[in-house]
Design a protein with these regions (language model features):
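Donor nucleotide-sugar binding/catalytic pocket of nucleotide-sugar-dependent glycosyltransferases
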Residues: 130, 143-221, 225-231, 235
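N-terminal subdomain of nucleotide-sugar transferases
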Residues: 1-45, 91, 116-118, 255-260, ...
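A short helix->loop->beta-strand "cap" motif at the edges of active sites that frequently abuts
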Residues: 116-121, 178-180, 201-202, 269-271
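Alpha-helical "lid/cap" subdomains adjacent to substrate-binding clefts that gate access
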Residues: 48-72, 125, 129-169
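A conserved, positively charged/aromatic
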Residues: 90, 113-116, 136-140, 171-178, ...
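Short N-terminal targeting/anchoring amphipathic segment
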Residues: 85-106, 119-126
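A conserved catalytic-core segment of Leloir-type glycosyltransferases
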Residues: 22-95
């Protein structure tokens, strides 16, 4: 995974690593950005190399968009990264488990090197990037079901735009990827994968992200309110890295709250977000 702790994919990957370790499995986590002193977590590359891979990918996207910053981080093209197959941790591994590997962690060529190693690969998808050309969420676009081109996230889309060129590279990459097992973290994501041209021939399993029962557990509601100094209201909890990101769905949450108020399910003064 690109990061050890930052972001939902990183948290999910690290929880899995810790659970496997507790169960007695020898597991290592390769990351671009290490954020702890754990000996199980191994950083890839030097600091200057990491900056170069990150900047080079963004530079290519920026120039293809004629120097517009719009959607600069909405897409990823995996044109640069690190060859992890030479690392001792990789060579010693029986199974390779990929998570979120964008922003300079692995290039498409690096992923091909992993496939060509002959080791069985599990890839957990935390968004749609693997089954589209360059976007992490297709929104209403359905071109990933046929062939990505005329990309809505590019300033000047066309039949042979950046999205189409990356799509063709991915198509070639995944056509020779065996054995590859895909994991989706939700049934919705699984349905998108099974409709995509790139991955619909691959086996897909749904394994939702889990929560630690030690950190998250049921408690008496009134006691919890008292201990946490929570107001005596209907509390709705919403969390996201950025609530201004449309794919996080905050607008749907607000619509739902309005409906609850309009239908008098909850009085407005008794709601706490």
């Amino acid at each position: 995974n690109t990061s050890e702790k930052t972001g939902g994919a990183a948290i999910a990957a690290r929880r899995l690593m810790e659970s496997l370790h507790t169960a007695g499995t020898d597991v290592k986590m390769l990351v671009l950005h290490k954020e702890s002193q754990s000996e199980q977590v191994i950083p890839v590359g030097k600091d200057w190399q990491k900056k170069c891979t990150f900047l080079w990918e963004r530079l290519v996207i920026w120039t293809n968009n004629l120097f517009s910053r719009k959607n600069l981080f909405t897409v990823s093209i995996a044109n640069t990264g690190f060859n992890v197959t030479k690392l001792p941790a990789f060579r010693e591994a029986d199974i390779i488990h990929l998570h979120w590997i964008n922003q300079g962690m692995l290039s498409l060529n690096n992923i091909q090197e992993i496939f060509e190693s002959g080791k069985p690969v599990v890839w957990t998808l935390h968004d749609m990037w693997e089954c589209t050309a360059i976007c992490h969420h297709a929104h209403t676009c359905t071109l990933f079901k046929s062939e990505c081109r005329n990309c809505r996230f590019l300033r000047f889309p066309g039949n042979n735009d950046l999205a189409h060129r990356v799509f063709k590279k991915k198509q070639k990459l995944f056509s020779h990827a065996s054995p590859l097992n895909i994991v989706a973290v939700s049934t919705w994501l699984s349905s998108q994968i099974q409709q995509s041209t790139l991955l619909k021939e691959k086996p897909v399993s749904v394994i939702p992200n889990t929560l630690s029962p030690t950190d998250f557990r049921m408690m008496d509601k009134e006691l919890s309110r008292k201990e946490l100094s929570l107001p005596d209201k209907h509390i709705i909890l919403f969390g996201a890295a950025r609530i201004d990101d449309p794919i996080k769905g905050v607008e749907y949450l607000l619509q739902a709250i309005r409906l609850l108020i309009e239908k008098k399910q909850f009085p407005q003064e008794k709601l706490h977000l």
